[in-house]
């Protein structure tokens, strides 16, 4: 076998050995926490942040998305968000949790990303927005 064939075969088989997650059917997902910013809280038109941990996600069906703090990432998820909105799911049994990685934003745009999240929080106060500035 030539070096080229060995390299090609390795490149084809290597992704099969990698695992993007370690989820197991019937088991809880290991909790993660975000302490640098955390959950965006709106209280009487004032915004603040509190430490967030996924162990708090009990009692509701959820869609959890972890996206980059870029417009392109928001656009890629727009179809999903529109489908969720049009489904008119009950807020007492369903919640969307969005973790935004502002570390993956265009340098200097973190302030604009947070401003956009604040606008969305005002529009959809029942949704959770988590700011992760450490990636």
Task: Give, region by region, the residue ranges found by the protein language model.
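Thiol/disulfide oxidoreductase modules built on the thioredoxin-like
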Residues: 131-135
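A short beta-strand-turn-helix
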Residues: 32-61
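Hydrophobic h-region of N-terminal signal peptides that target proteins for export
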Residues: 11-20
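Structural micro-motif
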Residues: 124-128
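Structural microenvironment flanking redox-active thiols in thiol-disulfide oxidoreductases
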Residues: 58-60, 66-122
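Short, flexible, glycine/charge-rich loop motifs used to bind or transfer phosphoryl groups or to couple energy/partner
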Residues: 22, 51-54, 86-87
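Bacterial N-terminal signal peptides that target proteins for export
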Residues: 1-7
């Amino acid at each position: 076998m030539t070096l080229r064939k060995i390299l090609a075969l390795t490149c084809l088989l290597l992704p099969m050995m990698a695992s993007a997650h370690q989820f197991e059917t019937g088991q809880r997902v290991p909790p993660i926490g975000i302490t640098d910013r955390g959950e965006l809280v709106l209280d009487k038109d004032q915004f603040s942040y509190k430490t967030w941990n996924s162990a708090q996600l009990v009692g509701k069906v959820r869609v959890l998305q972890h996206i980059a703090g870029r417009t392109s990432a928001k656009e890629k998820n727009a179809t999903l968000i529109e489908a969720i909105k049009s489904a008119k799911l009950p807020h007492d049994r369903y919640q969307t949790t969005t973790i935004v990685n502002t570390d993956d934003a265009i340098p200097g745009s973190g302030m604009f990303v947070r401003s956009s999240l604040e606008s969305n929080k005002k529009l959809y106060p029942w949704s959770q927005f988590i700011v992760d500035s450490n990636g």
